[in-house]
Amino acid sequence: MSEIDTNDIKKEMDNKNYRDPTDNKELLKWTKKKRKRSNDSMHINNFYRYNPPNFKLLASKYPTFDKYIINKTEKIYNIDWKDSNATKELTRVLLDHDFGLRIELPDNYLCPTLTLRINYLYWISDQLKNLKIILNDNDNDNKIIKGIDIGTGTSCIFPLLGAKLFNNWSFIGIDIDDKVLEYAQNNITINSLNSKITLFKNEKNSDILLKLLNYKEGSNTFNSSNDDHQDNHDDDDDDEEYFADFCLCNPPFFKDLNENNNNKNNNPKSNCTGSVNEMVTDGGEFEFVKRIIKESFQLKCKIRFYTTMIGRKVNLNPLINILIKQYYLPKNQIQTTELVQGNTSRWVLSWYFLNKSTNLETKENNNINNNNNNNNNNNINNNNQFLTRMERRKLYREGITLNLDSDDNNNNNNNNNNNNNNNNNNNNNNNNNNNKIVEIIKLILDNNDIIYKTDENNIKYECKYLLNNVIVGSSIKLDRDIEFLFTIFIDLTTRLILFKPIDPKINNNNNNNNNNNNNNNNNNNNNNNNNNNNNKNNNNSCDGEIINSNLFFILKFLENIKNEIKLK
């Protein structure tokens, strides 16, 4: 090539802003833009949410990681995130330093990113707690939780992290490659977790989960010589209605090798290496998850909670439509969430089935349980349709009211109110308020017509909006260090805000009847009502908007819980 041609090429590269990969200054500029010191999208319990890795400390402690630092003259150390060897060593030292896990990560296999997977595990834990409430499960909180990892990989990352993060979790890891299972078994043995993790050898293109129905310890397992794990799974499927509490999966993305290669060419910043079995499957990610869905409708409640990661958002809604339209699964039994690490996002699709023995039914137009008052059926929308954010905000502005008193209770209360004086009325109101707290909680937990699928980040946003704009004057503050309180708050408020507004005609009719019966009381209590209205107006800056008293009672209930919980 002539000198003139070379100069022309350099000019063209300058015009197109090409970055020389050997230029460390340019590399540092790019990596500084990419790396964030905190990530509010991580799960609240994720260790790295407020404690990003200290590369300088890691480099001083691990010489094998120190050689990948590219900016030792800077205050904050960094690595080349496109270098697969650097990211692999980072994963290895983080597992050792922060979790006490020592693993071997062979070349040419997937290197797992930690924060996404930690978010995934904590999200599953949250959903299992919610599912326990929905199913009225009275199992001991320390009961062994059994998980199934579909495609466990050489690192066996989900079972290893799950066993470290949750003392009562155990796993069965499934894979189709003998060599992969050898590496995975070695990582399990190194960390002395044979008592919690078992590996299962499956065949390519065979059933993904159905074979586990006939699974027995020591049968078709990779580590069949292990005796320690047998105590945890000894014929549990015969004694219980379900075989496992949950399954999780990070499915292969691509249909074939050409699609994989095209993805690398279109995204030169991508650091994606892995074996063919890890990256490619017939039909790609969409068909693989479809197979899991199909098998789940054969297994039903044998696995309590089905989950899978989705790498391409374009596949999420079609898979949800398959669950709803093809298999007629109610929408309130489907959940999704987004997992975020830096600029990388993954999605999770999950669904569950209801046992026949539970009081909840799977029909879309069911009313709330008969254990609650029949009067509530008029106040709750019977259609399982997802509300948009604008619709929910409209609910906030209008205020949400739930008629929690039965007809009998209303009659009794009316008779009592007619006979009691003003002081007794005040006492009855206090007692009714206390009873209403219990009734609200019971109604929420027993109601099966609640739209339960919503994004976790949207939940937090909407709850914050609710606190700031509806519960005006409330002095209650959520302590982010209290996991239990925060989880309950998110769960209860999310369920409650998804109720449809009450028909004003129904309310007007009820109010007219009550007003006719209580004219005497209203005349006697005008002074008290005026005083109460003045107090409400002083506390409420919403220009006449109705404060949702039900949510206020829930918050007061949570405040009592908060006082009983010790801070971490």
Swiss-Prot record:
Region (Disordered): 1-20, 363-383, 403-431, 503-538
Gene Ontology terms: biological process: rRNA base methylation
UniProt keyword terms in alphabetical order: Methyltransferase, S-adenosyl-L-methionine, Transferase
Entry keyword annotation includes DNA-binding: no
Name this polypeptide is given: U6 small nuclear RNA (adenine-(43)-N(6))-methyltransferase
Keyword field contains Coiled coil: no
Low complexity: compositionally biased ranges: 365-383, 409-431, 507-538
Family: Belongs to the methyltransferase superfamily. METTL16/RlmF family.
PANTHER family found in the cross-reference section: RNA N6-ADENOSINE-METHYLTRANSFERASE METTL16 (PTHR13393:SF0), SAM-DEPENDENT METHYLTRANSFERASE (PTHR13393)
Sequence ranges of Basic and acidic residues compositional bias: 7-20
Purpose: RNA N6-methyltransferase that mediates N6-methylation of adenine of U6 small nuclear RNA (U6 snRNA).
InterPro entries associated with the record: DNA_methylase_N6_adenine_CS, METTL16/PsiM, METTL16/RlmF, SAM-dependent_MTases_sf
EC numbers on record: 2.1.1.346
Molecular functions (GO terms): nucleic acid binding; U6 snRNA (adenine-(43)-N(6))-methyltransferase activity
